[in-house]
């Protein structure tokens, strides 16, 4: 007999929530039947894979599973770089799963108007269940097409909670096709991000001031430009899901991976950028080749470079702290005690953001988060002790399908004429949808922000969101916010 899951009854609240004082770490909510909200700005494996210029994606799985990825490719206008191989029942019964992948991929490559330099082959859950020999499959494909770089990718949601997540795997596969080449001590790479690092971010400002060449997959327009990333002496990641890929890249190509922890905390920002400065001075030496043909910098040049990095960092810190203090003052003067809701899609440290805002006088009421990131553990503990009534809400719990109908923001005057009309300010798309507010920050995955610039930009976006309404319906349903960078 079928039973209704979380049936909505008149006068009964079914929306799950927990005070942070009682929230477990890292999972404050029980796992079960899941709901997917219409807020679709975060990227999926199709979007991320399209970052490799000129590469072709081939998905091998059941027809039902193909619908979502096909729609993603169609919506972003990249169907010319996308193909599928459907697994049918007879393939399971006949035991020809390996042959299906090999021959299916080969047939697609043979029919393309031009052979791509790289092919990303996505196998799925069914290959995992049936014990398909993936090593043999890729060995055969590489024998047939030695001029093509193949990357083993996965559309395997059953592995979400064991080992590397699909997102971590996909970010690591972004750099598998890179060929080993001599390292250039004047070059660094920013890796593992869907969105480009902001030019005025503290990270980019530091690297530019140091005179280093910056490689980033989002700026590559050709496969050859993409291959130039392999010359980097340091790979810098600031998305936690990019860390496994950065470690793999360092092991394979020989550069050093440096994880720059994303933060809103002043002491942590200073500490993290101090560590990065040390890595740069140890691994990089931007000298002209004619000055020292044997490679590296003469000792006096190395000392000069280290001093340049230290001086640049000192300026960035001083300017950043001053800008942060002013931004807090200006934003708080506009927003006042307006309730604030944050969700995890905005940045890698949602509890870190909540802590920063609460400590600076903002009225943060809710954080939408299904699991708490490891980096947020100190913030979780701090908030439990200092702001125990902060409420945590899930985003995938089945009962959350009722959330947006329970929150209704007043219609009528804008914030410019009537501050009372802003019932809640949302930071992130899911918070905007669940709170049903027109006043929200429309950013995903940190938006390429780092350091003090991340703090000041976030505050500026909050002020703008308070003053100007947006259409939730029109904006949050756009799949893969910023994915137009993939259309080359």
List the predicted regions and their residue ranges.
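An N-terminal assembly and electron-transfer interface module characteristic of large anaerobic redox
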Residues: 1-488
């Amino acid at each position: 007999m079928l039973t209704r899951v979380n049936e909505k009854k008149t006068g009964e609240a079914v929306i799950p929530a927990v005070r942070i004082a009682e929230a477990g770490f890292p999972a404050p909510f029980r796992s079960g039947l899941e709901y997917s909200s219409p807020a679709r700005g975060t990227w999926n494996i199709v979007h991320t894979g399209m970052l490799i210029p000129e590469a072709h994606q081939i998905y091998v799985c059941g027809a039902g599973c193909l619908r979502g990825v096909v729609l993603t490719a169609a919506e972003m206008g990249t169907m010319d770089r996308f193909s599928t191989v459907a697994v049918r029942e007879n393939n399971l019964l006949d035991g020809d799963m390996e042959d299906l992948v090999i021959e299916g991929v080969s047939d697609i490559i043979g029919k393309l108007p031009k052979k791509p330099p790289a092919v990303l082959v996505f196998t799925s859950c069914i290959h995992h269940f049936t014990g398909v020999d993936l090593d043999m499959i890729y060995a055969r494909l590489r024998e047939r097409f030695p001029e093509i770089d193949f990357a083993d990718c996965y559309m395997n949601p059953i592995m979400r909670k064991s080992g590397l997540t699909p997102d971590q795997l996909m970010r690591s596969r972004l750099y598998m096709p890179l060929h080993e080449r001599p390292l250039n001590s004047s070059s660094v790479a920013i890796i593992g991000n869907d969105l480009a690092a902001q030019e005025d971010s503290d990270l980019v400002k530091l690297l530019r001031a140091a005179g280093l060449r910056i490689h980033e997959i989002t700026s590559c327009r050709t496969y050859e430009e993409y291959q130039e990333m392999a010359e980097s002496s340091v790979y810098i990641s600031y998305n936690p899901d990019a860390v496994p890929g950065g470690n793999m890249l360092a092991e394979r190509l020989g550069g050093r991976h440096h994880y720059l922890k994303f933060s809103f905390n002043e002491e942590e920002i200073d500490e993290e950028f101090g560590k990065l400065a040390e890595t740069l001075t140890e691994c990089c030496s931007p000298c002209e080749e004619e000055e020292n043909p044997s490679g590296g910098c003469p000792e006096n040049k190395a000392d000069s470079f280290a001093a340049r990095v230290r001086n640049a960092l000192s300026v960035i810190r001083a300017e950043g702290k001053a800008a942060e203090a002013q931004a807090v003052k200006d934003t708080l003067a506009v927003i006042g005690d307006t309730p604030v809701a944050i969700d995890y899609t905005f940045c890698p440290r949602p509890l870190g953001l909540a802590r920063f805002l609460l400590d600076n006088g903002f009225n943060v009421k809710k954080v939408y988060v299904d699991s708490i990131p490891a980096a947020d553990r100190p913030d979780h503990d701090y908030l439990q002790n200092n702001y125990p009534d902060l409420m945590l809400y899930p985003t995938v719990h089945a009962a959350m399908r009722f959330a947006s109908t329970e929150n209704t923001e007043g219609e009528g005057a804008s914030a410019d004429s009537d501050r009372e009309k802003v019932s809640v300010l949302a930071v992130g798309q899911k918070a905007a949808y669940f709170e049903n507010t027109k006043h929200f920050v429309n950013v995903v995955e940190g938006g390429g922000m780092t350091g003090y610039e991340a703090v000041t930009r976030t505050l500026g976006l909050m002020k703008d969101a308070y003053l100007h309404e947006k259409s939730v319906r029109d904006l949050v349903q756009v799949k893969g916010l910023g994915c137009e960078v993939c259309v080359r």
